[in-house]
Structure formats: structure tokens, C-alpha cells
């Protein structure tokens, strides 16, 4: 029955469909489309965005965690890691739900997914927006004095990140309360069902939420980034700590580019959101294509952010080069078999005779080791001793020569010379 009704909807005229659904407020990314093209194009775009964004964010997270493992984490690196975690959460959980809803045209993902879909998406986006404000503030502090480290205590970092996610989860909470599944025209839909008692509250929510999540954070972040950039321009004129000043300027430009790009790609989604939430009775519905593309642009932020980090950050580029060199230079360990030569066979090929250095040298690691290790090495390595050399040292130790006991060796030196002649 549901599929038959959906087929009728798909074949119907778009104007009739918009009129029949004009009074409905869809949620969870669900949007019944009267075009088969949109039901194919939008999921394909979301799949491409998810694939590229997942790989990019995975690289950023891996490089940041590797840096944390090698040295103490910094505040800015922790905030960038928070942005990447929010991005990868959107690509793993929210975007697939939107793509599935577009493909099927009927909401069959259940009541819980309907209630939590918009809330989870807006929670991650709000966390990113608040993180940009903190990043801009920390960036300004770093630009003011690059030699002075910004508070990097683990307790401070974890408290700040926890506060960001708590606030971000509370702001879109009304969407959780009023999103639910409803049957309409024989089709299961995910809708925002606001009772008459809460109509005024939701009207106020529709006005305040964009201000708290988008406009105000954008203004604060822009203010701090502007001050940080001006501070970098002033300090770059001086010659002291030039390296830290250049690094501060590059960091400011990179984070500013990320914030501006995110704001521009998020703007169409807010236009569609405000249009739907403040739609008057009998007013025109926003075009379905505009709503669908605005959601694709919103998710594409999670793909663009890691690309900006990887292209503009010298640390990330150095990390990628290191990984690439490790991958192309890694070779399997080749174990060479050492052939034992009999003790009596000391013949060697011409031109292949070992030099005296190779016969008597000892590795530096064994030479610099402890006395016990050097003793064990001496026991294991048996150096052959020639008979003449052994006899010489034996006679020298047992019977000292007359020359050693001669009190006036210079008088006998001439006699020895004559005897030799």
C-alpha cells in the first residue's frame, strides 16, 4: 500500500505535491520528492562527500593522535581534533540517514532515528560552531605572544571540550522533543509535530536558535580572528622570534579560511531552515532542490575542513610526507644465510680477501656496552692467534730481556749496531 501510494506521489505534478504537503514540517532529513532524478543525485553526492571526508578526517585525526603520543598535546591541536571528530561523526551517522531517506522516499528507519536525526546533526554542527569561537580566542592569545604557551593542562582541555559538547547538545533539544513519526496519506513520515501549547515556545526557538548557533559564534570568531591577524602583521615587522611569528600567521590564516568556508557552505541550510520554520499559511514552500542541495553543502563542510588542514598546515604536510616515505621505502626484511667456512680452509677468492679492519673490528654498540655484555661478546667471538705472536708475548711475560734490566742502555747501543753489521 505504501509503495503504491509513493508511486502515485512520484508520478504526480510537483505543484499538487507542494500544495498537499504545504502544512507539514518534515524532520530527520526526510523530504518526499516528486522527482526520480533528485532521489538519485542527492544520495550519490552524499556518498561521494562521505567517502572523501572520511578519508580526510581520518588522516587529520591520525596525525593529531600521533603528535599527542610523541609530545604533550596543545590547546589548538586538541580543538582541531574536536572539529575532526564532529565532522567524522556527521559523515558516519547523519549523512547516511539523509541518503537513505532520499532513496526510499518513505520513512522506515524507526521512531528513535526520526527523533534523534535532526538533534544529532545540529548538535555536531553547534559543537563545531562553538569550537571555532574557542579556536579564534586561543589563536588570538597565541598571536599576541607566540613564545608563551596557552594553557595546555589535560584537565583544562578536557573541561573545555566537555563544556562545548554539553552546550551543543542542549541547544537543539526541542527538536528531539517534537520530532516523531506520523502516517499521512498512507505513508510513514518523519515530522515535527508541535502541539498548540508549545507553539509560542517553538516560534521563539525558531528565532533564537540560528542566532545562538550561527550568527553570534560567527561574529565572535570573526572578531578574534581579525585581532589575531592584525597582531601577526604588527609582530611580523619585528625580527625577534621570527619563526614563531610566521607560524602564528600561517595558523591564523588556516583557521580563518576554515571558519569562513564553513560559514559560506552552512548559509544555504540556514536560509532553508528559516524559510521552513517561519512559513506562513498559504506561503510558498522552498524548492525541493534548494533544500536538498543545502543539506549536501552542509555535509560538504566535513570534507572541506580536513582538506584545508592538510593543504595549509606545514605540520600536517610534513606528517603526510613522512607517512608517504614510510610506505614507499618499507621493504620486507631479508634474512641472509651465513655459510660457515671450515677452520682449515682459509683460502679466499682473489679480490675478495677481507681487509684486516673487517677481521678485527668490533661493533660500536658492543664496545660501548656494559662490562658484562663486552665479556659475553669476547667469549662468543674467538679471534685466531698466530704461533709466532703467541711465543713473543710468552717470552716477554715469562723472562724479561737483558735490555729491560740494563741500567746504561745507550752505551751498548753502538755495539748492537756493529754486531748487526
From Swiss-Prot:
Residues 66-74, 144-156, 226-258, 311-421 are cytoplasmic. This is Probable G-protein coupled receptor 151. Exclusively expressed in neurons of the habenular complex. The expression is particularly prominent in the medial habenular nucleus, whereas the lateral habenular nucleus exhibited a lower level of expression. Glycans are attached at residue 18. The chain crosses the membrane at residues 45-65, 75-95, 123-143, 157-177, 205-225, 259-279, 290-310. Residues 364-379, 409-421 have a biased composition (Basic and acidic residues). It is a multi-pass membrane protein. CDD domains: 7tmA_GPR151. GO terms for cellular component: cholinergic synapse; plasma membrane; presynaptic membrane; synaptic vesicle membrane. GO terms for molecular function: G protein-coupled receptor activity; identical protein binding. Orphan receptor. Belongs to the G-protein coupled receptor 1 family. It holds the Pfam family 7tm_1. It is found in: Cell membrane. It comes from the Eukaryota. Residues 346-381, 394-421 are annotated as: Disordered. Disulfide bonds join 114-190. One of its GO terms (biological process) is G protein-coupled receptor signaling pathway. Residues 1-44, 96-122, 178-204, 280-289 are extracellular. Keywords: Cell membrane, Disulfide bond, G-protein coupled receptor, Glycoprotein, Membrane, Receptor, Transducer, Transmembrane, Transmembrane helix.
